[in-house]
Amino acid sequence: EDQLIRVENIKGTIQADFIGGNEQNNTLDAFRGDGNTLIGSGGDDVLLGSSDGNDTFKAGILKSDGSLIDGNDGNNTIDGKFGTNNTLDYSAYASGRTISVDMGDLDGTGNSTVTISDGTTDKIKNIQNIIGGAGADTIIGNSQNNSLVGGAGNDIIKGVAGDNQLLGGAGNDTIYSGTGNDFIDGGEDNDTVSFEAATGDITVSLTTTTAQAVGGGMGTDTITNIENVIGSSHNDTISGNSGINTLIGGAGNDKFVATKGSDTYYGGILAGTTHTVANGESNSVDYSNASKVYVDLSSTTTDANGNNYSQALKSNSSTNDGFSSNIESTDSLYGIANIKGSSSFDTLIGNELSNTLEGMAGDDILEGKGGDDVLEGGDGNDTFIATSHNDGKDTIDGGTGNDTIDYSKLGSSNAINITLAEADIYATVTVTSGDNDIVKNIENVIGTAG
């Protein structure tokens, strides 16, 4: 074992070397070999990788026992040279120190800049992988196959091109999928995956932990330990899991597939922003996985940002016992116009928009409210309720079973006239001084008070 005194610069061997600097301005050169570890300490250091291997560069001060502590105050220059799997490791940094780096943002000499919250910067080149510290780091990859690890803290991690490993670690992280085939692991706490960069429709399911083809130019990703999803500006299909999820569709006509848990669905709106739902938006939630659901889109609550949302009550009972008990969870629906029910006794109520409400199997109650609605009963003995004489020109299909349209809420001056047609043939319901409906597969009619 050699002791080096008053030495600032070291060149390694052809083996896998471990080279640590001191408080001086060091030049540490791995030279040759695979698996070298170079540690810059207190000075403005130059760390050079080997010519024929993959090396690890660590930021921090080396203690006498070989461990690292936070405190590398230098402005370092780090070049991985010829390796294709070099790693820059900031895991020694404590929570009060953060890093920010965009590996694809190069200066005129081909270097990327790591900006550190203490005011120092590192210039890096030929680095493929970065490990963050305990702070809230921002790590953006490049066109290569990157491994980006946030560590502790609420990190932002962005994959670009290449087949990447994007790992959040502890903290509430936001991970952006890239265009390659990425492995995305949120780690601990409440994490979000974003597909905002997609160029087309995406389909993502948090219940699928194996590789899934996302679409929209985003490759085939493996997603695990993720609670929340941000979609694209296109027509997305997003499914949660059994946890508490927040699913954000963004622009486009999005479909959310509901699962267990008290979830929040944002159609055409980003969380924390203000948005007014416009007629013509066609965001939907699919409750076909639920035991039973009650949704009233016309009943809303206003959040702190001024956005209105409706609630969906999900029951753990599939019997016709109402919704006063056996409520498993409650979802919050932002910007949702269309609902698909479960296979049992659902109640689906629309709003002033042109809604599509699908009862599916079971004896369902469907009420369109305003707008030109499409109401489909599916299997079972369904009831369709007209709210008023001017509640829109609705299209109603009872489906199979013994189905009823109910106009009893209309006033005495709003008589209806209908002759029921054969199965699968539409008949017109004429409403005096009101909006006419077209209906098919209806067996029973309840008239108005007129």
Which residues fall in each region the model found?
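Extracellular acidic loop/turn motifs
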Residues: 13-15, 120, 133-135, 232-235, ...
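Glycine-centered beta-turn/loop sites at beta-strand termini
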Residues: 12, 20-21, 30-32, 39-42, ...
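Thr-biased low-complexity repeat/linker tracts and other Thr-enriched repetitive architectures
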Residues: 172, 381, 400, 438, ...
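GD-rich hexapeptide-repeat beta-solenoids
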Residues: 1, 26, 52, 60-62, ...
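Short loop/turn positions that demarcate and connect the beta-strands within blades
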Residues: 4, 121-124, 220-223, 330-333, ...
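Short, intrinsically disordered, charge-balanced linker/junction segments flanking boundaries
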Residues: 1, 77, 138, 347, ...
